[in-house]
Amino acid sequence: AWGVMYDDWHGEINHVPIMAAIGVQDEDKDRALALVESGANVLLIDVAHGDHQNVIDMIHWCKTQDDLVMVDIIAGNIATQSAAETLLAYGADGLRVGIGGGSLCTTRIKTGFGVPNVTSLEDIAKVANVPIMADGGLRTSGDISKALAVGTDESPGKILETPKGLYKRYRGSASLETKVTHGQQERNVEGESTTIPYKGGVKFIVNGLLDGVKSALSYAGAE
């Protein structure tokens, strides 16, 4: 979403958007300051449940730090209009929308919580005058077109060589494998892990996606 702001930012402060993720623990405050000192100018408060007091507290802390005054703060993930209004009221500069929409995510099944992404995006876009990031559930150009239509503005990974060909590891953000990798407790697993065939660089895919989006715009009568 922040890519659309590149021209304005490049002209005003002569650098491109550099985004980095932080959590909501005390140690993340030191991380935030270190990231900005290293060149980050957008911070994403990256938690599964963004409509939470800890997220609000982190937004407030970021907004009261002199060293972060020029830094945009994105908050998420959320799925409801009320959550968006809360985070915006505390100063969020952008929102990340999507709970349970990932193809390997099992949150909606295991917890009963979550909203279809298009519905979330449409509802939140009605009250949000900031950039919105659609997170999860974008598999085809049709999915991208729907996300764009309701208000939203490359996933690299290590290549695995096998006797059957090249693959990439694909993991849900709350999968057991991800939790183990990041040293988290092996509990509250709400995702799966798998391998998918390697399809080449994103440049070989993006043209087809762009063609699909352009076709969707023509059907919608866009000018």
Predicted feature residues:
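Alpha/beta catalytic cores of nucleotide-metabolism and tRNA/nucleoside-modifying enzymes
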Residues: 83, 89-90, 112-223
